[in-house]
């Protein structure tokens, strides 16, 4: 009986540590992701751009989806 109680207490302690670690990790990621809020979002290579408000990234143009601008004449 003592072993069962000990195992339950160890399981509860381990679960608490894991949950605390996960919440700290999520909080750290939230602060990192918030730094890019000032950047304008753009649609990258092969991203659907037709009939949307988004614009293609620099060096791409919209022809149903964002395609790379190729300068054939050099």
Swiss-Prot record:
Q: Where is the signal peptide?
A: 1-20
Q: Which protein, by its recorded name, is this?
A: Mu-Sparatoxin-Hp2
What UniProt keywords apply to this chain's record, in alphabetical order? Amidation, Disulfide bond, Ion channel impairing toxin, Knottin, Neurotoxin, Secreted, Signal, Toxin, Voltage-gated sodium channel impairing toxin
Q: In which tissues is it expressed?
A: Expressed by the venom gland.
Q: Which domain of life is it from?
A: Eukaryota
The cellular location(s) given in this protein's UniProt record come to: Secreted
Lineage from the top down?
Answer: Eukaryota, Metazoa, Ecdysozoa, Arthropoda, Chelicerata
For whether the record's keyword set contains rRNA-binding, the answer is no
Q: What does UniProt give as GO cellular component? A: extracellular region
Comment text on domains: The presence of a 'disulfide through disulfide knot' structurally defines this protein as a knottin.
What species is this protein from? Heteropoda pingtungensis (Pingtung huntsman spider)
**What residues make up the propeptide removed on maturation?**
21-35
- Carrying Leucine amide, the residues are 73
């Amino acid at each position: 009986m003592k072993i069962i109680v000990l195992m339950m207490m160890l399981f509860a302690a381990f679960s608490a540590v894991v949950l605390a670690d996960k919440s700290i990790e999520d909080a750290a990621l939230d602060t990192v992701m918030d730094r890019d809020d000032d950047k304008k979002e753009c649609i990258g290579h092969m991203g659907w751009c037709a009939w949307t408000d988004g614009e293609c990234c620099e060096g791409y143009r919209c022809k149903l989806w964002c395609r790379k601008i190729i300068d054939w004449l050099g």
